[in-house]
């Protein structure tokens, strides 16, 4: 129970950097001496100190370290990247014990960090709150194990399951829901829409309702029908345009030529190559349905305005899963789903 308490604190610390560590995972670390936390830290962003190093640096009396336990939510790294291996630093400082939440499935780690520490004669325990630690880095693990980005589907629908009225932009989500969605955009690496959504709504796909980073924008526009003066082509964020016409870069816009056959699968493969760890798919209905039919999704979020009846327009995607959780947002509800297949 004591180990779980400190690993839970590691998770809390790691969550402070959601959306900022790509392509690295979220990691938190706590150092405990005689039942008292004497140091803690988390990984802030790629290229900067890892969680363990920040925790070590925060310890005022370094002489206590050989009699201390270091807790870390993810297996310490074992390779030289932009920073030296944390496993070697832990061995060098001679910690009494190391407690790990989840093992790191990345090819360069994958048990090597734990082995370095164990071979140095330091007691190592792993798998503490493993499920929670894996869920913390669901994007990172999906990216490395499934070799594709973590996919979140999101749409808003009326009580009679339409996404708009008369195929025109229609207000379905309330202001509270919009804030929540913009937080989600800040958390995910990229955001994706199709041609029809770009033409009809002319969205900028930036994070406006809260203070935060803009995700990488992804546009599926097979025949390049979206005019270059539309908001998606603004210089506010890096933008990838998957199409069947041309390849090349123009400022912050990258055109990626992709075969029409197995388009979604080929696009996800390319996004993996580009180190995009997660995408939120915001529409339209046809694009969302393609992801659903191919079973290429990890989580789905449906915003429902049950009191709104639109009678006609774009029909919401066909989706028959059972929600894992339902939250009220005033006159909206949001249903959350996880793919168990």
Predicted regions and their residues:
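Short acidic/polar alpha-helix capping motifs at helix-coil junctions
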Residues: 20-21, 50-54, 76-81, 144-146, ...
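Proteins enriched for Cys/Gly/acidic motifs involved in redox and nucleic-acid/cofactor modification
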Residues: 20-21, 128-156
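Short capping loops/turns at secondary-structure boundaries
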Residues: 106, 110, 126-129, 144-148, ...
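Hydrophobic, well-ordered secondary-structure segments
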Residues: 114, 130-137, 178-185
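Enzymes that bind and transform nitrogen-containing heteroaromatic metabolites
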Residues: 3-25, 40, 60, 64, ...
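Zn2+-dependent cytidine deaminase-like catalytic core
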Residues: 31, 36-132, 216, 290
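Short low-complexity, flexible loop/linker segments enriched in glycine and/or proline
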Residues: 113-115, 139-142, 207-209
């Amino acid at each position: 129970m004591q180990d779980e308490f400190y690993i839970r604190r590691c998770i809390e610390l790691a969550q402070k950097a959601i959306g900022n560590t790509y392509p690295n995972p979220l990691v938190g670390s706590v150092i405990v001496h005689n039942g008292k936390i004497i140091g803690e830290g988390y990984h802030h962003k790629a290229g900067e100190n890892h969680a363990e190093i920040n925790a070590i640096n925060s310890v005022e009396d370094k002489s206590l370290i050989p009699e201390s336990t270091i807790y870390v939510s993810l297996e310490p790294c074992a390779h030289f990247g932009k920073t030296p291996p944390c496993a070697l630093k832990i061995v060098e400082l001679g910690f009494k014990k190391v407690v790990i939440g989840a093992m790191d499935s990345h090819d360069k780690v994958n048990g090597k960090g734990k082995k370095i520490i164990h071979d140095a004669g330091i007691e190592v325990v792993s798998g503490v709150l493993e499920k929670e630690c894996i869920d913390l880095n669901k994007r990172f693990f999906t990216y490395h194990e499934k070799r594709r980005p973590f996919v979140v589907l999101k749409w808003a629908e009326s009580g009679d399951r339409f996404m708009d009225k008369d195929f025109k932009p229609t207000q379905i989500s309330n202001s509270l829901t919009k804030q929540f969605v913009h937080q989600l955009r800040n958390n995910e690496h990229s955001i994706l829409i199709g041609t029809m959504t770009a033409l009809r709504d002319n969205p900028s796909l930036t994070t406006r309702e809260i203070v935060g980073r803009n995700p990488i924008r992804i546009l599926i526009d097979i025949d390049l029908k979206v005019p270059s003066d539309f908001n998606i082509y603004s210089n506010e964020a890096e933008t990838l345009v998957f199409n069947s016409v041309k390849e090349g870069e123009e400022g912050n816009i990258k055109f990626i030529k992709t075969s029409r056959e197995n388009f979604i699968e080929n696009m996800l493969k390319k996004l993996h190559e580009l180190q995009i760890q997660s995408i939120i798919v915001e529409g339209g209905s046809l694009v969302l349905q393609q992801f659903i039919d191919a079973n290429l999704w990890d989580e789905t979020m449906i915003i429902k305005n049950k009191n709104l009846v639109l009678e006609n327009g774009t029909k919401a995607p066909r989706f028959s899963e059972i929600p894992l959780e339902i939250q009220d947002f005033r006159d909206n509800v949001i249903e959350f789903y996880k793919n168990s297949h």
